[in-house]
Amino acid sequence: MYIQNLELTSYRNYDHAELQFENKVNVIIGENAQGKTNLMEAIYVLSMAKSHRTSNDKELIRWDKDYAKIEGRVMKQNGAIPMQLVISKKGKKGKVNHIEQQKLSQYVGALNTIMFAPEDLNLVKGSPQVRRRFLDMEIGQVSPVYLHDLSLYQKILSQRNHFLKQLQTRKQTDRTMLDVLTDQLVEVAAKVVVKRLQFTAQLEKWAQPIHAGISRGLEELTLKYHTALDVSDPLDLSKIGDSYQEAFSKLREKEIERGVTLSGPHRDDVLFYVNGRDVQTYGSQGQQRTTALSLKLAEIDLIHEEIGEYPILLLDDVLSELDDYRQSHLLHTIQGRVQTFVTTTSVDGIDHETLRQAGMFRVQNGALVK
């Protein structure tokens, strides 16, 4: 798939912009704080209905406007798909093929993107929350059902935490509702964990040969989804549910004492190992960067395997963060397969073959010129 054109209205520092893209490589050049990252973010938001930079949607709307609009024409194997996302202070509304989607979880998945920005190099050494968000965003692109389950889990988790707070402060003494909320949480938590386990195994399958290639065969990458659950079959929904019930039974008094849910997928993590050693703790910066790059490149093949289309790759000021060898490996891997957007302050360092087939855009103060 590829984006044929994009139109922005009142998005960040863009008053209005219309762009036609090449279906292979598009390079966006400009000084810092001119709007390069905003353009990349707009493509990502069109795809995911949320930003990778902020959870406050109001920041996406131009300061003097009431709403922002992103429109794009996505080309797939079976034809063109117009997409539109309107962001207002009341919320977001998305259209696919001119049809308004009742839920954003139904909207997500029509356009698949992979964002690789400098902060993604912290995927390995960052907090568990960073890695959980990575899993949730990437699984959601290929599984709308997962987004629904995750949203439901977060809703029930919030309700359960609220009730635990009431028990903690003795505003409530009857624990019957806690049992009801626990049963509801367990059912959906099991679904979330199973999907994360399956995704982690798929990601490892694709990331291992990529990592081996970058490390010249010297390193083996393995992934482990880390959860406090103790189950013999990690993909058995009923066994995971039983394990959660047992955990919550043991934690009940401690949860009431603290007023918060102490077990569940919201506390899980993904661990990365290189040659059997935890790369977050013991890996060099080079190994950590190779791991992050391998994971991002693995997503390309994983998404293609799931939906039969290659996603769009967004490289936001990340090439300058990679040494020549890793940069060359990245560009060689995607060449000819994936529509790619690259932002940079200078074309120095980008190989001539990539530039030869690229559409070139210059951005200054929210204005774009091809």
UniProtKB/Swiss-Prot annotation:
ATP binds at residues 30-37. It comes from the Bacteria. One of its GO terms (cellular component) is bacterial nucleoid. One of its GO terms (molecular function) is ATP binding. The keyword ATP-binding applies. The keyword Metal-binding does not apply. InterPro entries: DNA-binding_RecF, DNA-binding_RecF_CS, P-loop_NTPase, RecF/RecN/SMC_N, RecF_2. This is DNA replication and repair protein RecF. Keywords: ATP-binding, Cytoplasm, DNA damage, DNA repair, DNA replication, DNA-binding, Nucleotide-binding, SOS response. It holds the Pfam family SMC_N. NCBIfam families: recf. Recruited to foci following DNA damage; probably interacts with RecO. One of its GO terms (biological process) is SOS response. Belongs to the RecF family.
